[in-house]
Amino acid sequence: MFDVAPSELLLVAVVALVVIGPKDLPRAMRVVGRWLGKARKLSRHFRSGIDEMIRQSEMEDMEKRWAEENAKLLAENQGQGNQTASTSSPATPSPVSDDPAEQNIVFTSPADLEVNTADTSHLAANHTETTATTAASTPAKPKEADQQEKQS
């Protein structure tokens, strides 16, 4: 639709040379270049605005899905907890609300979950100290004994 062939560009250049003249042609080309640059900048800005709106919409959809999944998991976990409690004592289960604000659920975005690898070196040392302390203070289970042998 907006295809510009080389022959059309040559025709426009010849007409511009004849109409504007060789003396003012460089200045005219600079003005045209500035206007084209402004048009490209405006187009890029407009396109980035649309991309940002699409990204925000997708993030809202993902947050809604996360809220639904968290509510389902919470309901399942509370249902399992109520089943074990009902076998030991007859108690009425509390109603589960679908409102995440009432459930005190904290949602995190994928950006909050990023880990800076440069800052994790001290975490590895703390982790080994913690596991050694925990392993010494708790009795070893057969699975843990096998895992400790594999690590050594």
From Swiss-Prot:
**According to its UniProt record, which protein family does this protein belong to?**
Belongs to the TatB family.
Write the protein's name. Sec-independent protein translocase protein TatB
Gene Ontology MF annotations? protein transmembrane transporter activity
| GO cellular component labels | TAT protein transport complex
Matches recorded under Gene3D superfamilies:
1.20.5.3310
Q: Where is the composition biased (Basic and acidic residues)?
A: 60-71, 141-152
- Identify the main location: membrane
Question: Which top-rank group of organisms is this from?
Answer: Bacteria
Q: Where in the cell is it found?
A: Cell inner membrane
Q: Which organism is it from?
A: Zymomonas mobilis subsp. mobilis (strain ATCC 31821 / ZM4 / CP4)
